[in-house]
């Protein structure tokens, strides 16, 4: 539109400092495999226009049972990253110091961080556990209390389908 063209017509103009900024060249983004902020998400790789068959969910395990009013911030938090959680462990394993973790909001461009943060809000209550808040569940058949991420990865290893139950206003 006219406003866009007006505002961005000089986007590549600037002073000598602006012109000295080094930036990769190319038509597409050059993904940095070492970045802990932005990673190339695998979700669309090998995707095509073929329709996938929808299968029945059978022999699934329950990953979590939530009550009412589970918000988007319970599901995908934007707050601080706990050093003792799966996302914190991932960042430490990638040589990020605890005081440099930043927040889930700042690291939304890294699917590895975000999937470890899913359901990790410190106030979420999984009714499968008594008197415990945070992103935890019970893994079956081991009966061990694990982070929701760690349990999900164990189930994935054995191709175990998962379900989550939640009350009204889920995702509001």
Question: What are the language-model segments listed below?
Answer:
Residues 1-172:
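Fe-S-dependent hydro-lyases/dehydratases of central metabolism
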